[in-house]
Amino acid sequence: LRSYRWFGGDGLRAFSHRSRMRQLGFGAEEHLGKPLIAILNTWSDINPCHMHLRERAGQVKRGVWVAGGFPVEFPVATLSETFQKPTPMMYRNLLAMETEELLRSYPVDGAVLMGGCDKTTPALLMGAASAGLPAIFVPAGPMLRGNYRGQPLGSGTDMWKYWDDKRAGLIGECEMADLECGLARSPGHCMTMGTASTMTSAAEALGITLPGAASIPAVDSAHCRMAAASGRRIVEMVWEDLTTDEILTADAFEDAVATVLALGGSTNAVIHLIAMAGRCGVPLTLEDFDEISRRVPVLANIRPSGKYLMEDFYYAGGLPGLLGRLARVPGALHAERRTVSGGTLGEQVADAPVHDEDVIRGPDTALADEGGVAVLRGNLAPDGAVIKHIAAEPRLLKHTGPAVVFDDYHQLQLRINDPSLAITADSVLVLRNSGPQGGPGMPEYGMLPIPSYLLAKGVRDMVRISDARMSGTSYGACVLHVAPESWVGGPLALVRDGDPITLDVRARELRLEVAGSQLADRRAQWQPPPRRYER
């Protein structure tokens, strides 16, 4: 055991370490020779996605004790998508570094990683991958479905929908008060297929959770049992020396990409999975997403791309059911690879039942023939851009319209409802200086608001282009992550009001219909914008 280096033997250091364990109240007979399991807990009073994890950590400990291990709980940074500004994206790598260094520096033999809110999952897995110990992930789980006057509500997705209705004058403060109370009713992360559900599902597809773990509602008693089972399993993994490098392989990342695309999942998964793969030495690229998206259909009928919510998905069979259906697509999954269960992915999903064929589809009844996220290229995005086309109005997937340009998010907020801009439903809204450096931190500004006077006319989607990200709960014909970003002089910086822009998702193209000579003249005149932050 790795921990024996700290506590075993008759040297001064071992004596000192055992003495300090006694100071903590633990005799040598309680921990010496047993796997020490770090429980990395992202619980916080200010993070509603994780507010139940203090209790769940106790259930993980129970499992560790039962299996003959010794649990030690570590509080780590909590990344709350709801409250942290300007964006928790700026802190993902900080949590990844904290995770890695805690696991490297303390006398632990394995780790249980607890979290679920958007950036937490990739951060914990990145850190654990670099540390290289046996590790298992316990997803926080989705909250219960919301309720508005008897109708199910999806967090994020229905918030945007009803906010647009309010801006259009269709509902008032009374309705908004009911919505405010009904949108989020329990602990857990968003119960739509937002970034949280997407990334915890990706973690399960990677094989770093127990089968079915990602779909269990946060407050379901099955979630308690899963936490305890994860505690038991990590002790076994330590004795088996089953480390992250045996789980997080190139095949595993390809399967995670296929799963995200079949779920109609968040565009943020593109950024996170590429970063996670990089930590594991796996060369995952935008081209891999593009290639896989062309052969993997959308099988999950979950908002914002579909009709249902994560609670329905769980009852319908959860991620094991979806993976079982995805396995029917030739070449979609690598069934022989190992997972933390000790078996193979194929064994996990071979007999996984599906109880509702409308929630979890088969290849013959797919919501779309191609994966939910498409990679775009062209003279406006030479290094690529993405669009969640499954959540856009089909009429906009091949569209040419005049640009209406906003230089930053503040200007967008001030001017979007200005009638003098003469924005029409055919206009293409462009937001720049919202990328990693320009934002800063690539905030989720990409679902640009539609002018209120168009909302009042019934317009609910427009082509919108930015170098920002958007929430996984968002929807619409939003082209995101345009690269290079405008702040460093990417082509987005050269767009002017009225320039024709063409989006063609089927052809994977994003083009600025302006002559190259004109663009060269504009580039010669371009000046980088002033930095808007001091640190």
Question: How does the language model describe each region?
Answer:
Residues 1-38, 42-45, 49-51, 56-76, ...:
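Catalytic or ion-coupling anion/metal-binding cores of large enzyme and transporter domains
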Residues 94-106:
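Short, well-structured alpha-helical segments in soluble
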